[in-house]
């Protein structure tokens, strides 16, 4: 049974499911023209050593993960997988102001060839507990995404970068996730969408597809997350 929603949960749910009229993604592409960009996840046995505090805590913490830079290098995503978990570290280099609970990152996955269902994981800056939502290609448009209990061993935390950060010494927003892949269905590849928000400024993967802090990109416009050695599923 889903627990009673607190104020933060309600705010997060509204942030995710609200889709303005006139659309939020670029209208100069169609699913027939869109070619899904791909991210490669690295297999890394160092991921269990991650200190989940929202920052790059020590020199080698995220070193054995794939490096992905988007939006002119302002959004940096490190990705790795190990023992049926997906690990994400997201840096928003532009966000140097701390708006606790308002700055956030959402990462969404859907197993390829697994139907239209997808799961979104939310980490908010300054909060140690993330949130999980489930939806499908229809509910993304009609506001029907549902807040569900977090899967066991899920971590979603937002914080401020430390002096160990590899990209910018000025303190900025950083987010860390540990997502149990078994909870959404093990697969070799996933449809993948990520969005990090600083007030009205939005950065995404795939890049430049949304300009609003609200809503989820339609599933057909998502990118793809996979591993070269087929070790993710």
Language-model regions, residue ranges each:
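Secretory targeting signatures
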Residues: 1-24
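Short, intrinsically disordered, low-complexity terminal segments
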Residues: 8-11, 39, 137
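Acidic/polar low-complexity flexible segments
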Residues: 24-53, 106-135, 170-172, 181-233
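Surface-exposed, glycine/proline- and aromatic-rich loop segments on solvent-exposed faces
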Residues: 34, 58-139, 197-203
